[in-house]
């Protein structure tokens, strides 16, 4: 049997030629592939430029088919299409063709809309993409270019990114591709495109923390978590949008992220860009941080999975500070297993951060069996019955029932009263925020937004005696919560008491809404315990419903195990919104962003 190896790369503004290496069958092969692919992917225009070459017309950003195509005398089979065949035409595209076998992965481009073209691979899980990359069925460079194209296509509306670092992302991808080709395996993040909240220093890139006064605060070294992502081979796409100073309010000059499910609804705070990017398929995972709910609330609002680890589990070296004893570094991803891969890469002791714990970092993927026998699942019926709307209560109860079916033993627990902790969180945070901003506040007070300025003023006005009273109450709460984990391994709770609020409702925030938003988040930041947030339903308004599980200090492995077991039997985490194509940019602009000559894009209002 004669063989022809076909390559169809995608670099630059034009497609490279289809160039068989065996000349005798080249004309028939090119004709065969042309017909096959027009039927299989409905490419509108394939332009033959010579007897042995043809190109796509009006090239748009790449669709990664990564197919192995077998052309035999009586049959053509598309054996692999990102792991699955999508139509009969893909399996049996042609009949009675010449005896040629094409075994090289193909990357096809055509002039269909990139949003639709990229939809499938954009929503693969991180671990699925990792497997494709490590088997060399996907190219890190192709994947990164395609993801950059998707960002360019959609993020003009969603505003998930403050800065897209396209050039360095492509350099990361090329390095990963070369290493994988040489047999170097850095682990499951090798070659995978991720993004980070704009509080983590990346050398040579500004760390704005969502603040106009920091627009030119270029970092001179990487944060520890960035260095660890690089060591794991991850491809960093850019910096993600957030509220001013990681507090409550999105502020100019940076655009406010939009909730992909419905932009009339709140995207969460402060790690809004992290959750929006993952939800919209603009990265496979994102670093985030939480001081009072900033991982769990955006994850809840956007229907994605978030892990807030134990305080100190992850180094905060070169991470912009809101409140030192409350700040947690965590992860947003599509699944608990995906998030755990990232957490494992970034966690651990750090000589540059004395507050980073020396507790050993477990292999989170070990023991993801789906069996929860022996796990004691704590349930406080009073918490499930009070302050919740009906949809949230039903979805949370259904999630608990599913965990029970998986083998978890339900244990009745009584959680300590959280009313003090909800309101104590604000002055405790305020004092530490005032300290973090002492070099720029009050000297540049007029450049601060009203929410962050008010928090700092509260901290500056607090007396030492008042602060000590708050710290004692915090210590008592932590002790009472620790006692709960003597009876239960995990406790299941809601996240948002009344579902995702609208933007209009958030613009008229009052004490009742503040309490509802923070009831299930702030107290556990005060305690420093870990939590995982999981989608568990869809409300009548089409917005996601979520629940969370909390555990004792350094119990992330147990939480990941339970979360993975739940997601193995449900599909809520696989639901995704319809992307707002009406707001997409033109294909020419998408190509410029996807091309190798891209430069970083600073998006502002």
Regions found by a protein language model. Give the residues of each.
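Intrinsic, low-complexity polybasic segments
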Residues: 1-3, 9-28, 33-36, 40, ...
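Short helix-loop capping/hinge segments that flank enzyme active sites or metal/cofactor-binding pockets
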Residues: 189-211, 366, 371-381, 428-482, ...
